[in-house]
Amino acid sequence: MDYQELVEEATRQISSGVFLVSGQQANPMTIGWAQWGCIWGKPVLTVMVRHSRYSHSLLEDGRFTVSVPAPGGMKEELKVCGTKSGRDVDKKTLLSLKTVPAKKNGIPGIAGCAIHFECKTLLKTEVSMEDLEPELYQRFYNGATQATPDGDPHTLYFGEILAAYRETK
C-alpha cells in the first residue's frame, strides 16, 4: 500500500464528498471536510460531525470507516447520504448500497468506492465557538442560518488509520 498516494487521491476527492460510515448497521453519511496527517506518531484521519447528525451518536463507539468514491463517481449516492438522515431512512437499502468487509475495525466500507480508510478514535473534541475565528463562526455556525440556536457545532474525531487500501474488484 502506498499510503501517501491514497491520501493524495482522497484529498482531491473530499470537496466532492466521501462517505463516513459508522455504527453496527454501517450508516453512511456524506462529508466534505477531513484532514489526514501524522499525530502522536500515528497516521490520523480527522473527521467533523455536527451534534445534530445521527452519525454523531454512532461515532461514540470509537470506530469509523471513510470510503472514497472514484473521481466523479457515486454522485447520486453522495447526494442522498448528505441529505437524508439514518434516523429516518435506511440509506443502504434505499440506494441498494453494498458493503465491503472491514479488515481491522469492524466497520465495513461502501462497495464501489476506490479507497477505504478504517479508523479507531484516539480523541474527540468539540469546536469551541468562543475560540473560533469570527469569520468562520459567521460563515458556518451563525445561529440564524443553522437549525439549532447554538449553531450546531462540530465534534472532531481524530481516528488512527488502522487500514488504508484500494478496493479490489
Regions found by a protein language model. Give the residues of each.
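Active-site-proximal mixed secondary-structure blocks
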Residues: 1-31, 35-169
